[in-house]
Amino acid sequence: LDQFKQEFREVFFSILPVTLVIVLLQVTLIHMPFSDFLQFLLAALLTIVGLSLFLFGVKLGLLPIGESLGSSLPHKGFFWVIFFGFLLGFVITVAEPDVRIFAQQIEDAGERIATQNVLILAISLGVGISVVMAMLRSIFNISLTLLLIPSYILVFVLGYFVSDDFFSIALDAGGVTTGPITVPFLMALSIGVVSVFGGRDKVSQGFGMVALASVGPVIAVMVLGVLFS
């Protein structure tokens, strides 16, 4: 219960400034219909309660299981590291709320660029492949620079072959993957993998998976753009 109170307090003081700014705008400039304003206040309250419960659940279950899986997979063999690394990255991204909201907004824009499900699939595939790369990096002690620099070079090369719409969407796709589900789970997973190998620096080797998980969807959506073109 104390842990939940702490999460509630942190979320409350995070949401409060945004709520106060909206209230100030309502009083001074916007003057939205009163029913809409009440709906916003109710939504703010639900957000505080819901996010508090979510973060409580993440710290209670998601982080420990992520670290446990990360420390167990390297013992099961190379194939299982690749298979479950990809599978975990894929399904955790499919469940990511930010990704779904992003894909829905693209579809609602009405530009017929790609459907919501196609975008979610492409982004999830990109994260899945990135998680595999990150886990192999931790196992074989590969420098993060050797993976990130070629990845971003590939991003800009692909940028010449996609439309401006897909280029913008692809770059934003890398940001939406760093959501409240994906980030804590992947960080715990990465630290769990590194903990298996003695003498490894948990900072230099345990972190960086989120960076790789961000560039993977960018490349995946750009490849989708090349196929669509």
What are these model-derived regions, one by one?
Residues 26-38:
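Short, hydrophobic transmembrane alpha-helix segments
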Residues 2-12, 37, 162-229:
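C-terminal transmembrane helix-loop-helix hairpin of multi-pass membrane proteins
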Residues 9-29:
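The first (N-terminal) embedded transmembrane alpha-helix
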Residues 60-77, 102-105, 110:
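Flexible loop linkers connecting adjacent transmembrane helices
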Residues 17-22, 50, 76-86, 149-161, ...:
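Small-residue-rich segments of transmembrane alpha-helices in multi-pass membrane proteins
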Residues 80-158:
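Helix-loop-helix junctions within the multi-pass membrane cores of secondary transporters/permeases
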